[in-house]
Design a protein with these regions (language model features):
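Alpha-helix boundary recognition
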Residues: 20-21, 67-68, 129
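AMP-binding (ANL) adenylation modules
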Residues: 79-81
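Generic signal for short, ordered secondary-structure residues
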Residues: 13-14, 45-46, 117
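Charged, gly/pro-rich active-site loop segments
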Residues: 1-11, 84-156
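Short beta-strand segments
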Residues: 23-58, 66, 72-76, 85-88
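Short, basic/aromatic recognition patches
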Residues: 2-27
Length: 156
Protein backbone atom coordinates (compact mmCIF):
# COMPACT_ATOMS: atom_id res chain seq x y z
CA UNK A 1 0.00 0.00 0.00
CA UNK A 2 1.40 3.40 -0.98
CA UNK A 3 1.75 6.03 1.71
CA UNK A 4 -0.79 8.85 1.67
CA UNK A 5 0.82 12.13 0.70
CA UNK A 6 -0.39 15.26 2.52
CA UNK A 7 -2.19 17.87 0.43
CA UNK A 8 -2.84 21.60 0.89
CA UNK A 9 -5.23 23.31 -1.52
CA UNK A 10 -5.79 27.07 -1.55
CA UNK A 11 -9.47 27.96 -1.95
CA UNK A 12 -11.50 31.13 -2.32
CA UNK A 13 -14.58 31.91 -0.26
CA UNK A 14 -17.07 30.16 -2.56
CA UNK A 15 -14.95 26.99 -2.69
CA UNK A 16 -14.57 27.13 1.09
CA UNK A 17 -18.33 27.37 1.61
CA UNK A 18 -18.98 24.49 -0.81
CA UNK A 19 -16.48 22.38 1.13
CA UNK A 20 -18.07 23.25 4.49
CA UNK A 21 -21.68 22.76 3.27
CA UNK A 22 -20.98 19.07 2.72
CA UNK A 23 -19.54 18.54 6.22
CA UNK A 24 -21.24 18.87 9.59
CA UNK A 25 -18.60 17.58 12.06
CA UNK A 26 -16.77 20.56 13.50
CA UNK A 27 -14.73 21.70 16.46
CA UNK A 28 -15.51 25.24 17.64
CA UNK A 29 -12.61 27.01 19.36
CA UNK A 30 -13.43 29.97 21.59
CA UNK A 31 -11.45 31.85 24.24
CA UNK A 32 -12.08 31.42 27.94
CA UNK A 33 -12.12 34.48 30.22
CA UNK A 34 -8.42 33.88 31.01
CA UNK A 35 -7.59 33.80 27.27
CA UNK A 36 -6.91 30.07 27.03
CA UNK A 37 -8.58 28.12 24.21
CA UNK A 38 -11.76 26.11 24.77
CA UNK A 39 -12.72 23.47 22.17
CA UNK A 40 -16.20 22.06 21.63
CA UNK A 41 -17.19 19.30 19.20
CA UNK A 42 -20.33 20.55 17.41
CA UNK A 43 -22.65 19.92 14.49
CA UNK A 44 -22.76 22.84 12.09
CA UNK A 45 -23.72 24.01 8.65
CA UNK A 46 -23.65 27.04 6.36
CA UNK A 47 -26.55 29.48 6.14
CA UNK A 48 -27.75 31.23 2.99
CA UNK A 49 -25.53 34.24 3.80
CA UNK A 50 -22.35 32.15 3.91
CA UNK A 51 -22.00 32.04 7.69
CA UNK A 52 -21.13 28.88 9.62
CA UNK A 53 -24.06 28.17 11.95
CA UNK A 54 -24.14 26.11 15.13
CA UNK A 55 -27.11 25.53 17.45
CA UNK A 56 -26.39 25.38 21.17
CA UNK A 57 -27.58 26.71 24.53
CA UNK A 58 -26.85 30.05 26.24
CA UNK A 59 -25.48 28.31 29.35
CA UNK A 60 -22.74 26.48 27.44
CA UNK A 61 -19.13 27.65 27.73
CA UNK A 62 -18.84 28.12 23.96
CA UNK A 63 -21.78 30.55 23.97
CA UNK A 64 -20.58 32.54 26.96
CA UNK A 65 -17.08 32.71 25.47
CA UNK A 66 -18.37 33.86 22.06
CA UNK A 67 -20.48 36.61 23.65
CA UNK A 68 -17.44 37.85 25.58
CA UNK A 69 -14.95 37.54 22.72
CA UNK A 70 -16.55 36.97 19.30
CA UNK A 71 -13.33 36.02 17.50
CA UNK A 72 -13.56 32.24 17.07
CA UNK A 73 -12.14 29.42 14.95
CA UNK A 74 -13.93 26.41 13.53
CA UNK A 75 -12.13 23.24 12.48
CA UNK A 76 -14.31 21.56 9.84
CA UNK A 77 -13.72 17.81 9.58
CA UNK A 78 -14.70 15.24 6.96
CA UNK A 79 -16.56 12.04 7.80
CA UNK A 80 -13.40 9.95 7.43
CA UNK A 81 -10.57 10.72 9.83
CA UNK A 82 -7.88 10.83 7.10
CA UNK A 83 -9.96 12.96 4.73
CA UNK A 84 -9.80 16.72 4.11
CA UNK A 85 -10.27 19.43 6.75
CA UNK A 86 -10.08 23.22 6.99
CA UNK A 87 -9.80 25.82 9.75
CA UNK A 88 -12.02 28.89 9.45
CA UNK A 89 -11.44 31.99 11.60
CA UNK A 90 -14.19 34.56 11.95
CA UNK A 91 -16.47 36.70 14.05
CA UNK A 92 -19.35 35.07 15.93
CA UNK A 93 -22.77 36.57 16.48
CA UNK A 94 -24.98 34.93 19.14
CA UNK A 95 -28.76 34.88 18.69
CA UNK A 96 -31.18 33.51 21.27
CA UNK A 97 -34.46 31.91 20.19
CA UNK A 98 -36.35 34.11 22.65
CA UNK A 99 -35.06 37.20 20.77
CA UNK A 100 -37.82 36.86 18.19
CA UNK A 101 -38.38 36.32 14.47
CA UNK A 102 -34.82 36.96 13.18
CA UNK A 103 -33.39 34.39 15.57
CA UNK A 104 -36.15 31.87 14.84
CA UNK A 105 -35.69 32.32 11.09
CA UNK A 106 -31.99 31.61 11.66
CA UNK A 107 -32.85 28.31 13.35
CA UNK A 108 -35.14 27.36 10.45
CA UNK A 109 -32.34 28.10 7.97
CA UNK A 110 -29.88 26.11 10.12
CA UNK A 111 -32.18 23.06 10.12
CA UNK A 112 -32.99 23.33 6.40
CA UNK A 113 -29.36 23.59 5.36
CA UNK A 114 -28.32 20.57 7.44
CA UNK A 115 -31.34 18.25 7.43
CA UNK A 116 -33.87 19.56 4.88
CA UNK A 117 -37.53 20.29 5.53
CA UNK A 118 -39.29 19.88 8.87
CA UNK A 119 -42.82 18.51 9.06
CA UNK A 120 -44.08 21.45 11.17
CA UNK A 121 -42.08 24.70 11.22
CA UNK A 122 -44.31 26.34 13.84
CA UNK A 123 -43.71 23.39 16.15
CA UNK A 124 -39.96 23.60 15.46
CA UNK A 125 -39.85 27.34 16.20
CA UNK A 126 -41.73 26.80 19.46
CA UNK A 127 -39.36 23.97 20.42
CA UNK A 128 -36.37 26.31 19.95
CA UNK A 129 -38.02 28.82 22.31
CA UNK A 130 -39.08 26.15 24.82
CA UNK A 131 -35.58 24.63 24.85
CA UNK A 132 -33.99 28.08 25.20
CA UNK A 133 -31.65 27.51 22.25
CA UNK A 134 -28.93 29.85 20.99
CA UNK A 135 -27.62 30.09 17.43
CA UNK A 136 -23.99 30.93 16.70
CA UNK A 137 -23.40 32.59 13.30
CA UNK A 138 -19.76 32.85 12.28
CA UNK A 139 -18.75 35.11 9.41
CA UNK A 140 -15.55 33.75 7.82
CA UNK A 141 -12.70 36.27 7.84
CA UNK A 142 -9.79 33.98 6.89
CA UNK A 143 -9.18 30.28 6.45
CA UNK A 144 -6.44 27.74 5.99
CA UNK A 145 -5.84 25.61 2.97
CA UNK A 146 -8.12 22.61 2.59
CA UNK A 147 -5.73 19.94 3.78
CA UNK A 148 -5.28 16.22 4.21
CA UNK A 149 -2.80 14.53 6.49
CA UNK A 150 -0.08 12.19 5.39
CA UNK A 151 3.56 12.07 4.54
CA UNK A 152 5.19 15.22 3.19
CA UNK A 153 5.55 15.26 -0.59
CA UNK A 154 8.98 14.26 -1.85
CA UNK A 155 10.97 17.07 -3.45
CA UNK A 156 12.06 16.26 -6.98
Amino acid sequence: MSPQIATNTDVGLEQLLEFVRLRHHMVLITSRADGSPQSSPVTGGVDDSGRIVIATYPQRAKTKNARRRPEVSVLVLSEEWDDAWVQVDGTCEVLDAVDGPEALDGFVEYFRNIAGEHSDWDEYRQAMIDQGKSLLRITPARWSTVSTGGFPPQDS
